[in-house]
Amino acid sequence: MSEISKNEALILKYLASKNQEIEESNIEIKGLSRQDIASATSWLQVKGLIDVKTREEVAYVLTDEGKRYAENGLPELRAYSILKRKGKLSLRDLQEAMPDEYKIVLAQLAKFGITPKNGVLEYSDGHIEAEISRRQRFLSDLNTDDQEMIEHFKRRKNVIEEKKRSVRIVSINSKGLEQLNNFDQFEAIGEIDSGIITSQAWKTAPFRKYDLDAPVSPTKSYAKHPLVYFINEIRRIFLDMGFTEMSGHYIESALWDMDALFIPQDHPARDMQDTFYVKDSNFTIEHPEIEKRIKRIHERGFDGYSGWGYRWSSDDGKKLILRTHTTVTTARYLYEHNTYPQAIFSVEKVFRHESVDWKHLAEFYQIEGAVYDKNVSVATLKWILRTFYGKLGFEKIRLVPSYYPYTEPSLDVVVEVDGKEMELGGSGIFRPEVGKILGLKAPVMAWGMGLERLAMLYYGLTDVRDLYNTDFSFLEGYKIKY
């Protein structure tokens, strides 16, 4: 037999005395608050000692507009009172007297047959006043039995609002009666406080036993945001592989974001519809000395490489943008640390002028990895891609030839998830022109991917926007993979 608390026993005793079903909200017991009663009845229900039924009820409340009508009178009532007093009322006078409710008045009076003739409303009786007064009374008492008035004001909209509530009906059952008859622990101690200690009641009074199997309310868990957790996991993988983390800037010059990576100045990616440009004249471009090298290689190339053969614009290079990729961070880092070997990575935000939908965002995280070493080749690129994606849990991957303006050869990474293939990122080896611009003495292999698209697979989502929504059920219940 389940143990019950003193409050639960008081509820059972109260229900036994009533010997009938009663609304939980009508239970009144001295010394117990509404919260105490609700808690005790909930536990009695869980223990099977009372029967609980739920009845859905509908009530109506006044909106702000309805409250104004209840206090000041309905528009048609006030207008009809003026009309009754004057006998006639021009539409112009009505509009001046009630400018905000003019149309409402005309619509409601028309239902009683009072319509303007030659721009004038004329008084008419015919029990109109009684009907309008009935409407006014309804706003005062909100009688739910007056279905006609309810339908009338629901059609008018924004006067009354429907509210649904669940009413709990409780009654004691045979198990509860048996429990009550056997209950002899009204003085059992269920909670230690200073009074129990100072009175030394604990020496003689029995203690209520702990029920370790009693059901409890689920505890809400509060942990790191799923994206923060996932970013840390990506960092851990890179660091375990011996990589060094780097960081860059949200705002970059086109010189570094585009030109240093040998992207021509007429490339479609530079268009306003693809890139966010920033208006600012107080921005210092890092390592401006690289400009001469960029200009020469873009225009004329170098031994064995022809360049783009156009007139490179210094003004275009100085334009400021929100970085479109984190490869700009790789380029600058290698320019500043051009001794090999280097293994570097970053997980930072980039910005694209994208239309936001289920798989695209205008602001998102990009995972960037790069290795600078004399032994870099397509074979080592394929090996490190399989190793990296394998640590993310993707065992089946395919590398597909692709094109990127600053790598050659270039490969797309295609993974298999639940029997379906999905492109997850791009990779390649820096073009010789990029290495020449950066002053590198060995090849560089690099790869990158959008973090959010990867997180969608990791957390089983179908819409990338869900990662940024305030859906507490997802934030509290997302599962971590080990």
From Swiss-Prot:
Its EC number is 6.1.1.20. One of its GO terms (molecular function) is ATP binding. This is Phenylalanine--tRNA ligase alpha subunit. PANTHER family: PHENYLALANINE--TRNA LIGASE ALPHA SUBUNIT, PHENYLALANYL-TRNA SYNTHETASE. CDD domains: PheRS_alpha_core. One of its GO terms (cellular component) is cytoplasm. PROSITE patterns: AA_TRNA_LIGASE_II. It comes from Thermoplasma volcanium (strain ATCC 51530 / DSM 4299 / JCM 9571 / NBRC 15438 / GSS1). InterPro entries: aa-tRNA-synth_II, aa-tRNA-synth_II/BPL/LPL, Phe-tRNA-synth_IIc_asu, Phe_tRNA_ligase_alpha_bac/arc, Phenylalanyl-tRNA_Synthase, WH-like_DNA-bd_sf. It is found in: Cytoplasm. The keyword Ribosomal protein does not apply. It holds the Pfam family tRNA-synt_2d. Keywords: Aminoacyl-tRNA synthetase, ATP-binding, Cytoplasm, Ligase, Magnesium, Metal-binding, Nucleotide-binding, Protein biosynthesis.
